[in-house]
From Swiss-Prot:
Annotated binding of L-methionine, by residue: 57, 100, 240, 271
Co-factor(s): Mg(2+); K(+)
Reaction catalyzed: L-methionine + ATP + H2O = S-adenosyl-L-methionine + phosphate + diphosphate
Residues that bind K(+): 44
A Pfam family it matches: S-AdoMet_synt_N
Binding positions for ATP per the UniProt entry: 16, 165-167, 231-232, 240, 246-247, 267
Domain of life: Bacteria
Chain residues that bind Mg(2+): 18
Entry GO CC: cytoplasm
Protein name (record): S-adenosylmethionine synthase
Gene Ontology terms describing biological process: one-carbon metabolic process; S-adenosylmethionine biosynthetic process
Enzyme's top EC category: transferase
Pathway: Amino-acid biosynthesis; S-adenosyl-L-methionine biosynthesis; S-adenosyl-L-methionine from L-methionine: step 1/1
């Protein structure tokens, strides 16, 4: 008997106000960590109309021109015209930055690297599955690809009436746990006022959606909802206030896996909200790539100032090829999840973070996304006593 379900995930473009804020926060982090790898950064941004407010706690020997970094980031995104209502050249930039609390420093700094204490308590999840070639859920993967295509066509001038703000939403039909068809695709994009809705709809379907979605998933039952309100001229920080860390499901697995609640952007890797989640993805992906399970979710938790995780747990949703207790043992044998060792293993003390602030932190193939490596898949497979797995990444 066929078991049919629907699952939906969304993504947003680099011009979405929350993503503007994320990119500013990570651009500041990149500027500092490139000079001072041991900097402590917790940088937040708020964007609205003609203003950007950058605040947080930063302890470093480096210097960064936060105002200019902010302006450059906004301009690179595409907010470079006063007629858009938000312009990187003209917007006000206000900063309020203090230092990291000495009470936190006590538990995090001044130790050997491998004994670096977690920057805060918290729980993080990592997930992987065989749904796509990047070991990610299909709905979020294609939602990201749609808004990335929107940005590409905007920037290369093929669709010159596109503007920076956009959102996508992909609903896939699953049969017995496998994606088989696209039920509904939503694409909302900001646009210049002169384009007709008919022309916009036709171009979005033909130039953005169809080149990205697998053609065998599109049939007569697939619904295309393009700018469902009929008009999207006012957008970006003019239409909505943007805030760092407000797109945590877009940043991760599109709702297919659980989330511990902590955001990533603007945080240096001593914050386990970020490094712990990256490590959990690394573990889960290698487990699936190694053939130990077809789906895997890892939870890891920490206490502030303590290096060793307070817990590690495994869920394979009935797809495990060996017992979950054995998988947990293999994790402890082959992955060191202390923050200092995560930072060392994944080479996280580099200016790599602004690239993560758009189109998802996972399922990416760029070399700086070290947590996407599957270099331990074969080791895990052999340790589990399994036949050769089909490792595709």
């Amino acid at each position: 008997m066929t078991h049919t379900t629907l699952f939906t995930s969304e993504s947003v473009s680099e011009g979405h106000p929350d993503k503007v804020a994320d990119q500013i926060s990570d651009a500041v982090l990149d500027a500092l960590i490139g000079q001072d790898p041991n900097c402590r950064v917790a940088c937040e941004a708020v964007v609205k109309s003609g203003m950007v407010f950058v605040a947080g706690e930063i302890t470093t020997n480096a210097w960064a021109d936060v105002e200019q970094i902010t302006r450059n980031t906004v301009l690179q995104i595409g907010y470079n015209d006063p007629h858009l209502g938000f312009d990187g050249e003209a917007c006000a930039v206000v900063t309020a930055i203090g230092k990291q609390s000495p009470d936190i420093v006590m538990g995090v700094d001044g130790r050997e690297d491998q004994e670096l204490g977690a920057g805060d308590q918290g729980l993080m999840f990592g997930y992987a599955s065989r749904e796509t070639d990047v070991f990610m859920p299909a709905p979020i993967t294609y939602a990201h690809r749609l808004v990335r295509q929107q940005a590409l066509l905007r920037k290369n001038g093929r669709l010159p009436w596109l503007r920076p703000d956009a959102k996508s939403q992909v609903t896939l039909r699953y049969e017995n746990g496998k994606p088989v068809a696209a039920d509904c695709i939503v694409l909302s994009t900001q646009h210049s006022p002169e384009i007709s809705q008919e022309s916009l709809r036709e171009a979005v379907i033909d130039e953005i959606i169809k080149p990205i979605m697998p053609p065998h998933w599109l049939d007569k039952h697939t619904r295309f909802l393009v700018n469902p309100t009929g008009r999207f001229v006012i957008g970006g920080p003019v239409g909505d206030c943007g805030l760092t860390g407000r797109k945590i499901i877009v940043d991760t697995y599109g709702g297919m896996a659980r989330h511990g609640g902590g955001c990533f952007s603007g945080k240096d890797p001593s914050k386990v909200d970020r490094s712990g989640a990256y490590a959990a993805r690394y573990v889960a992906k290698n487990i699936v790539a190694g053939g130990l399970a077809d789906r895997c979710e890892i939870q890891v938790s920490y206490a502030i100032g303590v290096a060793e995780p307070t817990s590690i747990s495994v869920e394979t949703f009935g797809t495990g090829k060996i017992d979950e207790v054995r998988i947990q043992q293999l994790i402890k044998e082959h992955f060191d999840l202390r923050p200092g060792k995560i930072i060392e293993e994944l080479n996280l003390l580099r200016s790599i973070y602004k690239a993560t602030a758009t189109y998802g932190h996972f399922g990416r193939e760029e070399p700086e996304f070290t947590w996407e490596r599957t270099d331990k898949a074969e080791i895990l497979r052999e340790a589990a006593g399994l036949a050769a797995a089909n490792v595709t990444n």
